Regions:
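Retroelement reverse transcriptase polymerase core
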Residues: 2-273
């Protein structure tokens, strides 16, 4: 359901809903449009006083600077495009004097576009493992079955909405054709990033966990035993997200549906498979 002149701005809602219920749901989502983002600039990031990713690098370790790899023309253009995008949203900063330096890795996605990552192998080796417990996937899925109405939520570039500790930022420096940069936010590929994300979500939804929401890192499902309760359940979750400035990605969210994909399983009111 498109909600704006811009066709990129839309909500995915239950196809089987009666017209009047569907329209009421759209109006409800429009009233809460501030918790969604269609561009990274619209995601201000979570307050670092609430959550911040720390590397905890062993101070006795000698920093490693990798020599620059030779990139193909296509890969070079992909990296430059990624740098431009990340600079625009304030996710990276140019660095001149550094001790750690890593290379970029460019891989082709299924849609034919390029994914640019940073090879943090050396850095990750000297970071201790964060033992924060992740939920059991089978238990989460089983607990979702049996609910007539569900909404599946996904944050907009959720990892980038988590700040990286100031003392650790320069350790994430990487080489590009247009200079060296470091991350200001938690990047994919950093050790313990998943644990930090889960810690944030567990802390954020502490009062709701086990009730009307299930969370596994960046996958969320809001579930209601009664259809009449679902709007109220969503309202509560939206208020928490709004309070922490965590923005959602509408293209990966679906609202008030009877079934959906959760952690690789198709979940319905009757079963998961």
């Amino acid at each position: 359901m498109i909600i704006d002149i811009d066709p990129k701005k839309f909500f995915q809602v239950g196809a089987q809903l009666p017209i009047h219920e569907k329209q009421a749901l759209i109006e409800f989502l429009r009233d809460n449009v501030d918790i969604f983002a269609w561009d990274a600039c619209e995601a201000p990031g979570v307050n670092p006083n609430f959550i911040c990713h720390h590397l905890n690098v062993n101070p006795s370790v000698i920093p490693r600077k990798k020599p620059s790899r030779c990139l193909s023309r296509d890969h070079c253009e992909a990296v430059k495009e990624e740098v431009t995008k990340l600079k625009r949203v304030g996710a990276i900063k140019e660095v001149f004097y550094l001790e750690w330096l890593a290379n970029t890795v460019v891989v082709k996605k299924k849609n034919g576009k390029w994914r640019v990552c940073v090879d943090f192998t050396d850095l990750n080796k000297v970071c201790p493992k964060d033992p924060f417990p992740l939920p059991k996937i089978d238990q989460l899925v089983d607990a979702t079955v049996g609910h007539p109405r569900m909404s599946f939520l996904d944050a907009f570039q959720g990892y980038y909405q988590i700040p990286l500790a100031l003392d650790d930022q320069e350790k994430t420096s990487f080489i590009t054709p247009v200079g060296n940069y470091h991350y200001k936010v938690m990047s994919f590929g950093l050790k313990n990033a998943g644990s930090t994300y889960q810690r944030m979500m567990t802390k954020m939804f502490e009062a709701k966990m086990g009730k009307n929401i299930k969370v596994y890192i960046d996958d969320m499902v809001v579930k209601s035993k009664m259809e009449s309760e679902h709007k109220g359940d969503l309202t509560n979750i939206f208020q928490i997200l709004r309070g922490h400035k965590l923005r959602l990605n509408t293209s990966k969210c679906s609202f008030r549906v009877g079934s959906g994909k959760f952690l690789g399983y198709m979940v319905t009111i009757e079963e998961s498979r």
